[in-house]
């Protein structure tokens, strides 16, 4: 039932709004609204009841295991939520004077310093509100760098085929042509293809390391030399930073610019699709172009650096300073874990992934890159199973829902057929992993004995399989009270 | 180990299964020369008790003020239910609803949001949110250019929020899109129509139309919309969602209505929070839906014909279309939209109207009171919604400092963005302000003016 | 799965506790604990996950309609929760000096004044932590009053048979003998029986009005005269105060002492069984005996009245001042509703009850007191249905659970066979009541066509019918790790 | 109408169905002369925004202090998860779990609570909570009298919390039960064994044994328990639940262990909140279970043999047994127990031990520091847990006021309850206090003593 179906004309909930309409109204008549917007008229209780019940229809980290590759679904500490929501933080206006926000700004400054250290970069801007915006900022800075050096012939960005879709989409949004390079059998970038692709048109290379194939790109140093030698810059997509936190710094791998997804590595909540935050770090050479605002600490006082302080900045990317509340949560998370906790994250995330890979392999699942260590994730391919039984990766994914597990990422990366990208994250216990393995075994058995049942999954969810073809064909994006 | 549940026995068993001797061995594919990961700037971990105390102290340091600042972010009462529900684990810690069957809660809520937001804007459809108002405007500009096909120029009045213009420039510049600015009329604070008419013969993909504009002033939106349509440009509205309860919605502007309406969703139940997270909303006409960036939810059925919801039109998106996608956008501001949907549901049409009307009435009353003070006059002679520009006869920065010392944040200085507007404050009094608050502001301003004279 | 079954030896969650054991320990060895208590060793995430999932197994006001007679299950406004939990209120020590708690004490004082007005009593003490404790206080004051007047021969408390079980239990706890008096056919107290019962042994009468039969005791004024004439006092059980709020004041009905359940009438949360709060109001004659502490307002300052100020007080009933946080919630609730809201509560609670009674009667359900107005609740008796079909009130109750409604109160009051005591409360909408009526009709139809299915309910809950005979016979009250 | 969803049309339709002309008519059975319900002291309703502002102001008025007060209510760190989960609607707004199938969440949690609490106390069984520590002790006294059958006298040391003794007297007096007090030894702060022995020949239903006692001092619990058992009295323990992580649990006291152990549950994750709501816990030996008041949850199965939970032994309770019930208790403190269970689960045995051990160590350290100040000495020469009595050489009330002016709440005056203990402070430093906090207390006390000298 939609909230609108609980609505009844002229039902009023006065306690949430002023008790009367005011007398004063200077709005000229021709600018006044005449129609009533379609907002529901329901009681506070029915609103609470409706959305409480809706919430119960979601899977979430707080209720289920989410082995969702490339998404780093780890526990979101409850203290990060409540401390970031202290009333003074919530009520502070973004344009309030800096001296009324020194507590907040201290957190932001320290977060910048911590992220610089973790990534090995020269400076960090916190403004980016999501990974894709981080990429946009990074590539915009690469463009600004080349332009500042009069190097205007560089029109191409090189991207491995395993990359997230955001990488090529970002390059295009920044006015670049995308040169895709292939992956070799072991999951590494094809170095010959890279060498062939670089040249005077190369503006830069975007790389995720460990890659979305779940393996560490061993020749990253050589890639850096090749791209730099050709005059290009290196962009690090920090989607998988969780896998190497405290082990390797992107700066040490030779990257010039990096974004890190705080909603992955730093455990800010995914919130059903956002908000994220993706601070951007740069090496010395890109420092002038970093977007503002940035927090400075001068003579014991924190202040915003703006366009006046940074005349070469690419500018602003949000009305204020990005997703401040998300940044606070990440700050609290890092302070809770501390330096020693950073190492542990990557260690236990890697341990969990390799354990799960080993156990699934023992069950008979085919590992896409069987000769490699898993980073914090790994890929199972269902190709052989599908060829033999008709059961697809998606069928298995839906069947896992029935068993109380969120599905792994399916059909990404695109180059592995019928793939499941599995990332358990460090916060899951061995018992939970073992329960997941047991469920995978049950499904293997079901595929053998009743493949049609598996193909028709899910069975035990509030809904059977959703018809998304119909959703796209018969577009119904807003509710029509007329039916 | 905070948040890591492994016991020593677990680790031993897991390593045995893997066939490795140590966790360290699992990192053996990383070249040794790259392993330089010593962290020197990350302090040792704190217990939850310790970080709690630190954060309470920092929050106390920032304190509470009686604030009359608006300028794009607005203090409104947020019903307690909004965030108590929004932070439930099932909303807070869930992922993007790609697995529709396991995400019907979020999906249905987003469909309800789309319905509410489209109706509020008087438009046909809505997406499920963008990052914030400024970036939503930039995306609207890109969308207009894609739709228009021939022009890569956007016409933007200087009455649009200065930072929105700045963000838009940062984003569209990469695609060689030109942003052309139209000055404001210093008497009315509205778009200078005579200046606009100088562009009458040039081609533009879109005209951006703010309502209310950055000065709080109401623009002649019908005329502006028709002006754009007359020259085959798109009309892109930038609107305050609270004001839409009172003001003619973009879909009804001019003869045909705006084509795209975007804005900052923060006023709909999102705390000020030093600037974020907020959310951008984007609504448009049906015919533009395939050009719209961001996630969109559709209502459909399951295999048994039961109503359900799913992400749709994913073929526009980067995870499917990669370099040919409409936008690179992936993450949106789902949790903020959750809050906004609950907020709109709690208020309903009449509640939102009252919030808007009291915000308007309070600002009108405040301006009337302040104008009576010697040395204060309105900068513009135009109707306004819930913000107004006031020109002082003395240095305004000093006045603001004096107010602050009395616990009052008196507004923002327009001079920072509009060099011609010397000593001019932009002030805002939402429904949160009582008559006593307005009197307090009047009194401390009177004192500050006297002290500065 | 029990939380203990998620436990694993030596798993540690350091962030919730100090990171190490301290060096100093002066506890003598023979007083030290040697055994490890059976607390679970689980991660923060698994604790959150376990209890989040458990919560989803509950019915609650925030998710379901709860037509639970005599319990007044109404909406618990969310603002009452968050405002009562402001950090300063939570962190205030009960023994902190009064001048560091003037904000809190102002709320308590105003609540006392408001409750005095609502009940028409001379004074109110907030100390009682539950209805049953309110009763204990009331009867203890009655005893103190008689003792102070040297009237020591009064050993009996008169209680109508429809009363809550707490009434007779309280009287016995206070050392009294209970004289039960019957109810007449119309649901009123049998006046002849009352007259026969009163006498020199009568310490007092306990009365709920409107009674638990859902009707207003019309002859309450006469009852008051009879009891007072015999030298007894009148106790008002405020369980049903919601039904007459702002309409009649218990003080005006002649009562000497009253408790009111804030967790009913003033919408503080039931919390799965508490905490409650039940302030006690007294008429002038009982004022000296009121339990301490009480808040006084003198020269603009709030302070506690203690035994020194009230030498005849019966004393203290809690270590501090009762359930302060519950009182704060009730205070916020009353301030939200205001004087005009008090009237509305009883009006709409009564409207909802009479509407539901009318609709159920139309369906063919037998109303226990068909010639009476419903107060805020009413009784359906399933006796005829049970005699005819074997389907009991409990069967119907369980079947309602299947349909997403909490069951009404069953088998109370004891004098009506196979009864359902139904109280919809004022916060439910007509649509919800109509859906409930529709469900009751469905069940009536099911009783006609498939009574055995109804008898076997529930069917669609996480569990089938619980075996509570086994629970009592094979007592298993704590988990044994040995199995 | 806040919280009332009826529209005018709804009301009209409902009245038609009922056959009444007005809502007022529904009250026609109330005699007119009783309808005098005009409310004069209830202010007009406030919007949520208005009450929010009022409550924020009152909270700000009360402020934050560095507190060293204990005396029965203790400041401990409460993990954020505790109340975020506890206030979920499904726990917060649910009723007593009488309908077991619709209440498995609460029921299972309470079963887990009973297990944890019984184990912590070293006892066989636990109920699902009582109102608070003081009333739990009174119920334990009644229970002991019921069990003992011949004596109606209870022996209570004066080292038991004075208010607990007061509450117990209020409650048991009605049943003509006599409370006999045993003085403390002024040197040790423990039960005066010689005074106790004077009662050796008299019959008592129970001896109450506090651990730690009100002075924070550790009693010789083994000897006291055996003393009680030797004369066929029950041994009733009153214990602090945090301390149980470090101290020998009541079930192991003496040769046979205490018979009943009760206490205040507040230290287990419940905020101080000006005194409530807290919860009382009660645990006992198996053979006393049918004498135990309050709700008890049992594990059982459903009709299909699936594990489930239900209220059990209801035949003891007032709603079944009425005047023959074990107690009149109905409502308990369910939500508080929800919080306590989550708290204990988050901390685990080692976490709770550390909380206890740091509270102990901090108090030891504080006492050592303070003792070095001239004019401060320990009142008693005995080991203590996390509270200690300190005697000052100057008027202690004035000292406390000076500390308060510095933002420090220095403890409570024992003189209010123990006239012999002049100028004696009871101080407590839990794990929430840092070394800097202890130093601050030491320094402000030094200054206050100097100023008062």
UniProtKB/Swiss-Prot annotation, chains A, C:
Pfam families for this protein: Aminotran_5, GcvP2_C
Family from the record: Belongs to the GcvP family. C-terminal subunit subfamily.
Cofactor(s) needed by this chain: pyridoxal 5'-phosphate
Function: The glycine cleavage system catalyzes the degradation of glycine. The P protein binds the alpha-amino group of glycine through its pyridoxal phosphate cofactor; CO(2) is released and the remaining methylamine moiety is then transferred to the lipoamide cofactor of the H protein.
Residues annotated with N6-(pyridoxal phosphate)lysine modification: 264
Catalytic EC class: oxidoreductase
Domain of life: Bacteria
The EC number(s) this enzyme carries: 1.4.4.2
Gene Ontology cellular-component terms listed: cytosol; glycine cleavage complex
Keywords per UniProt: Oxidoreductase, Pyridoxal phosphate
Gene name tied to this protein: gcvPB
GO process annotations (BP): glycine decarboxylation via glycine cleavage system
Region feature (Disordered): 1-33
Alphabetical list of PANTHER family matching this protein: GLYCINE DEHYDROGENASE (DECARBOXYLATING), MITOCHONDRIAL, GLYCINE DEHYDROGENASE, DECARBOXYLATING
Protein name in the entry: Probable glycine dehydrogenase (decarboxylating) subunit 2
Taxonomic source organism: Nitrosomonas europaea (strain ATCC 19718 / CIP 103999 / KCTC 2705 / NBRC 14298)
Gene Ontology molecular functions: glycine binding; glycine dehydrogenase (decarboxylating) activity; pyridoxal phosphate binding
Curated annotation (Swiss-Prot), chains B, D:
The organism's taxonomic lineage, starting at the top: Bacteria, Pseudomonadati, Pseudomonadota, Betaproteobacteria, Nitrosomonadales
Family assignment from sequence similarity: Belongs to the GcvP family. N-terminal subunit subfamily.
Record's catalysed reaction(s): N(6)-[(R)-lipoyl]-L-lysyl-[glycine-cleavage complex H protein] + glycine + H(+) = N(6)-[(R)-S(8)-aminomethyldihydrolipoyl]-L-lysyl-[glycine-cleavage complex H protein] + CO2
Function: The glycine cleavage system catalyzes the degradation of glycine. The P protein binds the alpha-amino group of glycine through its pyridoxal phosphate cofactor; CO(2) is released and the remaining methylamine moiety is then transferred to the lipoamide cofactor of the H protein.
GO molecular function: glycine dehydrogenase (decarboxylating) activity
Sorted UniProt keywords: Oxidoreductase
GO-annotated biological processes: glycine decarboxylation via glycine cleavage system; nucleoside metabolic process
EC code(s) of this entry: 1.4.4.2
The name this protein goes by in its record: Probable glycine dehydrogenase (decarboxylating) subunit 1
Pfam families associated with the record: GDC-P
Superkingdom of origin organism: Bacteria
Disulfide bond positions: none
